[in-house]
Amino acid sequence: MAFEIPEDSTQLSQFVTLLIFTPLGIVVTALRFVAVRRVTRKVGFEDWLAVIATIFFILTNLAGLMAISILNGRQLTQEVIESPSDYSRMRKWDIAGLFFYFAQTLSVKLSILAFYHRIFGISSTRCRICIYLLAAAQTILFIAFCIFQGFQCIPLQRYFDLSVPGECKDEGTVILGGELPNSLVDFAMVILAMIMIRPLQLSFSDKFRVTVLFGLGFVVGIIGFVKIAVTYSTSELYAFSMIALWTGVQMFTALLCCSLPMYNTFLPIVADFWNRLSHHSLGWVSRVRSSQSSSKNSRKHGPYDSDQSPGPGWDDLVAYNGTKGLTLPQAPYHGDNHALGNVSPITHPQAYSKQTTRQFDVV
């Protein structure tokens, strides 16, 4: 059979998108491991979860490519009439892709939550509990999705052969029931990241950069609602192809959100990007906050406090590699310096020649 996917624009869009994003997802995870080696950190649980997520990302896109190749430019109803066997094979790849997608969603979120735990969880009981609750919620959703998918059609054989007597649940209802709670977990993870970042002694622009970084999770959640809207399209073929397309984009964005925090010590251009973004977007806000802070400090502190450093910045946060959480003690600490990376300690001169050494080496 001739290659006729270009005859339909939606199928062609799906085909090209999956072909492009699949190798990009592999590169994203590969760069993550290069970054880990550069800072001499041992490969951790979160890194292997990212590998698992990448494998299921590839399998999901492969299933989508196989399904669209079997459809080969035809309408769904046309395929059912012309070749019921092709329709059956296409639906088998389709349902396999759904299970791969469920597994990818679980593994990538667990990887992000493991990163949260390494950085914030050990030093904060509340954060640790929230991380565990979100991990448990996503695991329960994964199990529920897998069970529910098996009952979408009764009997299940009708999913692959429309001539079999029975009934199938509406596709829109199925997508709504799956993507809505999935997106809510995405939003909850981003909100948790914002809450954990808030008490850190970072400048406003640094906090903004970290917030935007984890804000990719919002993009993942929003794509879930886009998929829900697409499902209710009047064209079954359009809905079928566009959901697969947006699923590929969604999974890639999740992988990027999972691995991007590791790139700061590997690709200086990433840090430069955040610096430029913060400079252009928040310059006026920083000036206002700086003037307000200066006026308050002049009233509260003596002349010896004017040279105090504001605390660790963006590079220090992303370069943190400790096995302990991010603890920023208020009182000076003169104990051993547990440096697990190659970044030199940041020394903050205090009044009366006291010094506080804080080491951050995140990847």
Swiss-Prot record:
Q: Where are the transmembrane segments?
A: 15-35, 48-68, 95-115, 129-149, 175-195, 210-230, 237-257
Q: Which organism is it from?
A: Talaromyces wortmannii (Penicillium wortmannii)
- Cellular localization per UniProt: Membrane
What this chain does, per the entry, is described as: Part of the gene cluster that mediates the biosynthesis of wortmanamides A and B, reduced long-chain polyketides amidated with a specific omega-amino acid, 5-aminopentanoic acid (5PA). The PKS modules of TwmB are involved in the synthesis of the polyketide backbone, whereas the non-canonical C domain of TwmB is a bonafide condensation domain that specifically selects 5PA and catalyzes amidation to release polyketide chain.
Entry superkingdom: Eukaryota
User: Which keywords does UniProt give here?
Assistant: Glycoprotein, Membrane, Transmembrane, Transmembrane helix
Which pathway does the record list? Secondary metabolite biosynthesis
Keyword check for Transmembrane, yes or no.
Answer: yes
Taxonomic placement: Eukaryota, Fungi, Dikarya, Ascomycota, Pezizomycotina
Residues bearing attached sugar chains per UniProt: N321
What residue spans carry the region label Disordered? 293-312, 344-363
Which sequence ranges form a coiled-coil region, renumbered to this chain?
Answer: none
**InterPro entries linked:** Rhodopsin_dom_fungi, SAT4-like
Any one cellular-component term (Gene Ontology): membrane
- Family annotation (Pfam families): Fung_rhodopsin
For this chain, the family text in UniProt reads: Belongs to the SAT4 family.
Q: From the Swiss-Prot or TrEMBL record, give the protein name.
A: Wortmanamides biosynthesis cluster protein C
**In what way does this protein cross or attach to the membrane?**
Multi-pass membrane protein
Record flagged with keyword Transmembrane helix: yes
